[in-house]
Amino acid sequence: MKKRFERIFLIVMDSVGIGEAPDAKEFGDEGANTLGSIAEAFNGLHVPELEKLGLGKIAPLKGVKNVPTPLASYGIMQEASLGKDTMTGHWEIMGLHITKPFQVFPDGFPTELLEQLKSETGRGIIGNKVASGTEILDELGEEHVKTGDLIVYTSADSVLQIAAHEEVVPLEELYDICEKARKLTLAPEYMVGRVIARPFVGEPGKWKRTANRHDYALKPFGRTVMNTLEDAGLASIALGKISDIYDGEGVTKAVRTTSNEDGMDKLAEQINTSFEGLCFLNLVDFDALYGHRRDVIGYGEAIMAFDQRLGEILPQLGDEDLLIVTADHGNDPTHTGTDHTREYVPLLVYNKGIKPVNLGKRRTFADIGATVADNFQVERPSNGTSFLTELKPE
């Protein structure tokens, strides 16, 4: 049987949730609604392209009309995994269920872990808090250069980052330190998603992070749909953070991006390239620049900017292209704290030749992975239900 679509373009709007999940209370996220809160703060969101696709049919959003005949099929997805971080959400999208969440460290890392790291590296540690990579260099860069102590910090995601000046801690030593940290943080009580080497150069007031960053991620805890696509000789193109999130597993081509705008540019380039398979884009700015920083205005403006770019992309899609737009968790910028929020995520599925239908409430993000596998006739993941047959021709 011939595959339905030659190419599937999957866009994850990182952290763009659409209302509290049924288990939000267990995560301390009652009342969270990323899109709803932003729409209220703006007294109405102006997103004509998402509106035309059917965003207003998924949930009531101030300023977004519930159009009678949307261009896309639409629904809502609930996360089945026990976590609300980027890796968990993305791994589930490609067919895995995570039963033990990755740890986050809003108050810094435990003393025992740092003592082990000090003992194994012979270097002191400074920082040990949630911080932006540039701000912590301004704060501690000079002390690091004087003492040789490692700058250790984290974010709202499950990461342990180690910054060091390349003339103080040679690159090979920094990489060796990060490998030691990676081994230590595999322990269940720590279970960190990623360890990141963050080398920098320069002098006080003029610090500059170099391109020698290196990520020590965890490989997915099982095979994903991306692996099965690669095995079948199909494309599995990773744009933005996607390759890092899956530690390169099942990736046939990786393209780095510098921003949401750059991500959409890179997506447009792939649309104009001939391939058969999946092109998977993560737009991280929503989460990293606005959600965690609780910048509701910046977040709303970024959504409206994305909407405009979406309007440019849609006419470029061919008859055999399928576009899926979704998210990996929430991050309500009006919610308490700075962490992600446990929410439903939107699901919009567009092809110019299919009749729009209500895809309903999906019980797992893995329904996307199952649909991708179903379309390309590769092995389906053990989790998820394909909605391919629900996408009927006009």
Curated annotation (Swiss-Prot):
Keywords: Cytoplasm, Isomerase, Manganese, Metal-binding. Mn(2+) 1 binds at D14, D328, H329. It is found in: Cytoplasm. SUPFAM superfamilies: Alkaline phosphatase-like, DeoB insert domain-like. It catalyses: 2-deoxy-alpha-D-ribose 1-phosphate = 2-deoxy-D-ribose 5-phosphate; alpha-D-ribose 1-phosphate = D-ribose 5-phosphate. CDD domains: PPM. Its cofactor is Mn(2+). Pathway: Carbohydrate degradation; 2-deoxy-D-ribose 1-phosphate degradation; D-glyceraldehyde 3-phosphate and acetaldehyde from 2-deoxy-alpha-D-ribose 1-phosphate: step 1/2. It holds the Pfam family Metalloenzyme. Binds 2 manganese ions. InterPro entries: Alkaline_phosphatase_core_sf, DeoB, Metalloenzyme, Phosphopentomutase_DeoB_cap_sf. GO terms for molecular function: magnesium ion binding; manganese ion binding; phosphopentomutase activity. GO terms for cellular component: cytosol. Its EC number is 5.4.2.7. GO terms for biological process: 2-deoxyribose 1-phosphate catabolic process; 5-phosphoribose 1-diphosphate biosynthetic process; metabolic compound salvage; nucleotide metabolic process. Mn(2+) 2 binds at D287, H292, H340. Isomerase that catalyzes the conversion of deoxy-ribose 1-phosphate (dRib-1-P) and ribose 1-phosphate (Rib-1-P) to deoxy-ribose 5-phosphate (dRib-5-P) and ribose 5-phosphate (Rib-5-P), respectively. NCBIfam families: deoB, PRK05362.1. Belongs to the phosphopentomutase family. This is Phosphopentomutase. It comes from Shouchella clausii (strain KSM-K16).
